[in-house]
Regions:
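Catalytic phosphate/metal-binding cores of nucleic-acid and nucleotide-processing enzymes, i.e., regions
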Residues: 1-109
């Protein structure tokens, strides 16, 4: 899976609920499933996630996005730079643990 197409505009994807304004230049995505669709387009160079996006059964979580990235690595997906901006300590730790797994698999020799 080649997700880095030449000559495509870069996207910085901010995955969070509507109460959080993204930094200037970042695209706000309030739905984990939509975030995954955007990632599949191959234009995302940076992604920053919060855990809670709204009602989980309807919009998923930031962790769902990271688990998708983790699974897509085996198909050749090149992950973007990943950040976590979640403020809830337990949820932040869950996201960071998934990022660590992604880093280990992606950068393993």
């Amino acid at each position: 899976m080649n997700n880095k197409e030449p000559h495509t505009p870069a996207i910085q994807l901010w995955v969070d609920d509507p109460s959080e304004e993204p930094p200037k230049g970042w695209l706000l995505c309030q739905n984990a499933f939509r975030a995954i669709e955007i990632l599949q387009g191959g234009q995302v160079t940076r992604i920053s996630l919060s855990y809670h996006l709204g009602q989980e059964e309807h919009v998923g979580t930031g962790r769902d996005v990271l688990l998708w990235i983790l699974g897509a690595l085996s198909m050749g997906f090149e992950p973007p730079e990943i950040g976590v901006h979640c403020r809830v300590p337990s949820q932040r730790q869950s996201l960071l643990a998934a990022v660590t797994q992604i880093d280990k698999l992606h950068y393993a020799p």
